[in-house]
Amino acid sequence: MTEFDPTRHRMVPEQRWFEDFRIGERFVLPSRTMTDAVFLAFQAASGDNHPIHYDVEFCKARGLPGLLAHGLQSLVQTAPGAGLFPYMTEDSLVGFIEQSSRFLKPVFAGDTLYPALEIDELASNRTTGVVGFSSTVHNQRGECVLEGRQRYLLRRRNGVQA
């Protein structure tokens, strides 16, 4: 048996740097069904105590089919940490520098969400670069419920200038 080396204990064996990414590269994130438990956990973590997010009868009395997801509950599904991007960039990621979103359709308890990120921007600097993603979340009916953008600052390999 080989000796244990913690530097080789990685989800993704090869690290990627700014120049390793390409426009159009797509990162599919795990799907998730918005169960009552997910709603309750998010409501508790967010501190949003509006009954539209946790009281089924309140929602039904207002003509809604069930609990309405908080917008950030849909947005959080696009967190790159749910996929492989942060594991690919453990050595090169400097920081998360920008995020924006538009909430296009309501998300209700029982909906299954399918998030994805696609690289749509690569802006090279001297020793770093910005990787921009378009983010989308679709529901089980194929409707886009969220679209947005995320930007990350990554190091270039060995700080080499382009």
Question: What are the functions of these language-model segments?
Answer:
Residues 44-48, 80-87, 140:
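Short, intrinsically disordered, mixed-charge
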Residues 23-25, 30, 38, 48, ...:
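A generic structural signal for short beta-strands and their flanking turns/coil linkers
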Residues 2-69, 156:
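Catalytic strand-loop segment that frames the active site of acyl-thioester-processing enzymes
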Residues 1-22, 103-162:
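HotDog/MaoC-like acyl-thioester-processing domains
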Residues 62-69, 73-120, 145:
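Hydrophobic beta-strand-centered segment that forms part of the acyl-chain substrate-binding groove
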